[in-house]
Design a protein with these regions (language model features):
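Ribonuclease/tRNase effector modules and their secretory precursors
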Residues: 1-99
């Protein structure tokens, strides 16, 4: 089931600052900037395929570019795990009329 940003309350974020810096070096976006993904009214949040903790794939547009984030929820906070440019199939899902 996809969730849209308007279905969610105001978000609070947490992340590892070292991992944020590594993410910037690898993918060109840090976790401070990535929080703006939640400003996208069309943001999609889908269950990620994981076997350990519950994780979510978030697809949104920021500054005209599609991004994908992996997150987990801890109490009332969103923990950012990684953010990268969206893959073609993720872009297609975001742009599809199914949601």
């Amino acid at each position: 089931m996809a969730l849209f940003s308007e279905d969610l309350p105001a978000q609070q974020f947490e992340f590892d600052p070292t991992k944020s810096a590594e993410n910037f070096h690898k993918h060109g976006i840090d976790f401070e900037a990535a929080q703006r993904l939640w400003d996208d009214a069309k943001l999609l949040e889908l269950p990620a395929r994981t076997t350990d903790e519950a994780r979510w794939l978030v697809i949104a547009v920021l500054d005209g570019k599609h991004w994908s984030a992996i997150i987990t929820r801890r109490e009332q906070r969103i923990r950012l795990i990684s953010v990268r440019r969206a893959r073609e199939e993720e872009k297609a899902l975001y742009e599809s009329e199914e949601f």
